[in-house]
Amino acid sequence: MFLCYHTGKRQSRRLELEDKRQRILSIDALRGFDMMWIAGVDRFLMRAGAAMNNDFGAAMAAQMQHVDWAGLHIIDLVFPTFVFLAGASWPFSLASQRAKGFADRQIFWRIVKRFLILFALGLVYHRFLRFDFSHCLYNSVLARVGFGWAVAAATLLFCKRLKTVVWISVGIFAAYWLAGLLIPLAVNPAGVDPWAPREVAVGRIVDNWLMNGLSQVFGEGVMEMRRQNVFAALGCISSAFLGMYAGLILKREGWTPARKSGMLAAFALALGLGGVVAMLTGCPCVKPSWNPTYILVAGSIATMLLSLFHWLIDVKGRVAWSFPFRVIGMNSITVYLLYRFVDLEKTGRFFFEGTANFFPKPWAETVTAAGAAALAWLAMYWLYRKKIFIRV
């Protein structure tokens, strides 16, 4: 991870222009829109839904909570969209690094370094520094983002032909699908649905295998595997590949911005159709196991959103509305870690409790939640104004 701090108007303007040439504003805007949901907006909508005390409010609040197994809520799309956008940014980053003279070996080690940093940040996020290693979540969100992105990034780096990249990504997805289908059928009693609840799903089976193996080597209690879901990390590879293909569409030379938006929309529809076909074959959309249908459906929605953002920003030239999202998107890792390391809810109550007391009690909590979300955005805005971007 490195910290960029730009000072001086002339230098800042030059670096800003260079950065815009290397970045796609629609990707930054969509990344900010994605992270917004876990940067306080989810808590605000949950409190507002409870305060409404009606069916609409209950439905709105439910969308901010993860489904227990099969199904899909808005909040369930945040993680795969983040992985998708990491993949979408890579074609531009790769071209930029090669233009600066980096050899493929150097770029590969930068990929490895980024994965290791994300893995380490994930450990810190999940209280690794308490030194309670047996209960630490090793397969964290950041670790899975880094792993999925690293595999897709290295594939594009070393494969000279795009056709080879496509075949590798299709092979990985097919193998993942077959493993999710066949391993439960081989291990569980006959007649068990392989996509059924987590007790018989492939993620739990693989976790149990790992836990038993580690226990034999290191002794009982070496690691609590209930929440690791190691197998699902492999699914993140496919999500990153989908984002990478979207990025390649945006980077395609000779296509107009309008055509790129149209191709993204067509890609999204194809993925959505694939998700429908998968569901018709008996594979439900299951976020906790990151199963094939979930990969296709979440990828379809992320691609369609990118098509919409690209059409509005890069085709129609309507950029101003995206500024609040770009402020977050330029420091996405920072805002993700912020809520873990800073108690913004307590800070929100400190600054806004007096204002909240003018409202009935259910709405008072909504006001403080809105204040906490506003503080998070203001912190990102301060970093944006100071040209401080913490990137990995």
Where are these predicted regions, by residue range?
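Alpha-helical transmembrane segments and their immediate juxtamembrane cytosolic regions
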Residues: 1-392
